[in-house]
Amino acid sequence: LGLGALLAPVLIAAIGAEASLVVVGLVLPALALLTRPKLRLLDRTTAAPEATALLRRVPMLAALPEPVVERLAREAVDVSFRAGTPIVREGEAGDRFYVVGSGTVEILGRTFGPGSGFGEIALLRDVPRTATARAVTDVELVALERGPFVAAVTGHAPAAAAADTVVAARLGALSAGNAPV
């Protein structure tokens, strides 16, 4: 904007108002095309604010520094499941941590809604899934792959402590015969 404000009077004085509009009409689209690759790179390296805000609602992820949460949001994958569909099954290997974006998920009789995360036990304890998670309604989830999730959570002491608290509570509820918290 500043450069345009400086150049506009010079351009108008040199070639006139009409010709200036034609030049600007030709030059600006050409500049946009030339900078397109850099703009695409910027889009790929900037996390969506919605995904970042959703991840921040999960206590163990909220403890992470903002750049780490933004990186996780950039690497996250959006996944959908229809009502009644299993998302993860008890006994299978864990490969992702999930955060509910919309809809409802049921795990051992307990429901999880938007902003709730699940699947951390298998990833952080390196054990098979401890329960089946099923979509009660159509759900939109944000999925974090094992590697980035584990590295982020275990690499930051406050997040690791928050994760240990969640895991201990869920395993305690599971061993007591209750739904995980």
Show where each model-derived region lies.
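Multi-pass alpha-helical transporter architecture, strongest
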Residues: 26-48
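A short hydrophobic beta-strand segment most commonly corresponding to one strand
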Residues: 35, 139-148
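C-terminal structured domain segments across diverse proteins
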Residues: 2, 16, 37, 103, ...
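Regulatory nucleotide-sensing modules
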Residues: 53-131, 147
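Transmembrane alpha-helix termini and helix-breaking/packing motifs in multi-pass membrane transporters
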Residues: 2-24
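Short, flexible helix/strand-to-coil boundary loops that buttress conserved ligand/catalytic motifs
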Residues: 24, 122, 145, 153-156
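A small-molecule sensor/coupling module
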Residues: 51-54, 68-69, 128-130, 147-181
